[in-house]
Amino acid sequence: MCIRDRYCAFQLALGNMGTAGGGANIFRGHDNVQGATDFCILSHSLPGYYGLSAGAWKHWSRVWGEDYNWLKARFASLKGKDGKTKSLMNQKGIPVSRWIDGVLENKDNIEQPDNLKAMVFWGHAPNSQTRMKEMKVAMEKLDLMVVIDPYPTVSAVLSDKTDGVYLLPSTTQFETYGSVTASNRSLQWREKVIEPSFDSLPDHTIIYKFAKKFGFADRMFRQIK
């Protein structure tokens, strides 16, 4: 963190802040975190940081070649505290740091019809967050918990839950191919170095299998050959 602060202060002293083409690169903590947020693994926005307005959904409906009304029908509605009915389509979701509240909090306080019943931890270890005691309780209250990682993380061993827990082994970066986004927003392509170990699968294969099981793989992958 000190290095990041000093780098920004240095750029400020050089006059490179607040100017066209200036600024400092965003330092991210893990490989391709920038690409993940650009692609929108977020609870509060569509890809490209478009937000969740009706206009944003209509834009991405056109990009995806999807019917806007079909997408809209996939979301539940909820009557807010102001008495107005709101579609969850336009409401910010629960951030990863507070998913615990989605399980343990009274559902009248979480602005969605029901509490969370299932969680998928995909490339995420909860020991990077606080409230571990509450997290353990929340995990044990879930009906379903899925952990997707190259190796078992704290997500897989924190709770004493004995059923409804699945560990899906994913490949490492050396066992698959694909693009990553550097902190300067440049794209880099990586080739597969070795074959996947044991039964592990690349992330894109796992998500395809999920989509196929849920019945919308044809829609999700229609533009991917």
Where does each model-flagged region fall?
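Short, small-residue-biased leader/transition segments that mark boundaries at the very start
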Residues: 1-3
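Non-catalytic alpha/beta scaffold blocks inside enzyme catalytic domains
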Residues: 13-20, 27-40, 44-225
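Conserved hydrophobic/aromatic pocket- or pore-lining residues that grip, position, or stack substrates
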Residues: 10
